[in-house]
Amino acid sequence: MDQKRLTHLRQLEAESIHIIREVAAEFANPVMLYSIGKDSSVMLHLARKAFYPGTLPFPLLHVDTGWKFREMYAFRDRTANTYGCELLVHKNPEGVAMDINPFVHGSAKHTDIMKTEGLKQALNKYGFDAAFGGARRDEEKSRAKERIYSFRDRFHRWDPKNQRPELWRNYNGQINTGESIRVFPLSNWTEQDIWQYIWLENIEIVPLYLAAERPVLERDGMLMMVDDDRIDLQPGEVIKKRMVRFRTLGCWPLTGAVESHAQTLPEIIEEMLVSTTSERQGRVIDRDQAGSMELKKRQGYF
């Protein structure tokens, strides 16, 4: 990696660490959302650097839908144990009672009940006034216009027309009782930055990001990896082993794989250099309707 690129990554690292420390000093009860993906892994690594040699001054929160890949759950628990992090796991009890699932109820309802409502329940339950998230501006157009400190009202709603200025890296974290801030320390990073930093810092990631032979089927223009037996095959569908990996991770019925032979970090980085599509092309929830991500964020989604 050339010196110019290395300096760029260190500048991003310094900015993110500054934001994380600022939130820890300014807010009474912050939390770090941990979705187990590559961005969460980088964000956790930066947080550990920010407070080294001490421990994290806030817990990790995973809003569990019950439909993550099995490798993600194993990685989550191993990571929390390895680093001695306090891990909070919340699953929407009403959604569980109604047996909400993406196959029967669709991606929009599943996401709203198990993710958005589940997140709001957890934030209310523990009284968190600031929540870190790993979203980046290059991922999606609604995230591109969101501030690093994203103000949310007492119902956790985001109003894109009522955002606060962030001049010269000065962040306004003043809130009233019941209000909160979502904080995005990786806002200025790109997917390429994330992968190069993972390689530079030797950060462990879920193996699903690396290409391997996996059982997949084609459905609705997406390569779906069959992770357990909760799927009913439709007429003509056949499960086949193919060399695939994931650019983004979520609930397995709603996350498409991509055909790839990139089995190492340098190979992934090389693959990203020639990619012309967004990593979120494989996320079914982004296809629900035009502007679906912004609508979800207005309702309280991260």
From Swiss-Prot:
Catalytic activity, reaction form: sulfate + ATP + H(+) = adenosine 5'-phosphosulfate + diphosphate
Keyword Transferase: yes
GO biological process: hydrogen sulfide biosynthetic process; sulfate assimilation
Keyword Amino-acid biosynthesis (UniProt): no
Top-rank taxon, per record: Bacteria
InterPro entries for this protein: PAPS_reduct_dom, Rossmann-like_a/b/a_fold, SO4_adenylTrfase_ssu, Sulfate_adenylyltrnsfr_sub2
Keywords noted in UniProt: ATP-binding, Nucleotide-binding, Nucleotidyltransferase, Transferase
Pathway: Sulfur metabolism; hydrogen sulfide biosynthesis; sulfite from sulfate: step 1/3
One function term, GO molecular function aspect: ATP binding
EC number: 2.7.7.4
One Pfam family it belongs to: PAPS_reduct
UniProt family annotation: Belongs to the PAPS reductase family. CysD subfamily.
Subunit description: Heterodimer composed of CysD, the smaller subunit, and CysN.
Summary of the function given for this chain in its UniProt record: With CysN forms the ATP sulfurylase (ATPS) that catalyzes the adenylation of sulfate producing adenosine 5'-phosphosulfate (APS) and diphosphate, the first enzymatic step in sulfur assimilation pathway. APS synthesis involves the formation of a high-energy phosphoric-sulfuric acid anhydride bond driven by GTP hydrolysis by CysN coupled to ATP hydrolysis by CysD.
PANTHER family per UniProt: SULFATE ADENYLYLTRANSFERASE SUBUNIT 2
Protein name: Sulfate adenylyltransferase subunit 2
Source organism per UniProt: Salmonella arizonae (strain ATCC BAA-731 / CDC346-86 / RSK2980)
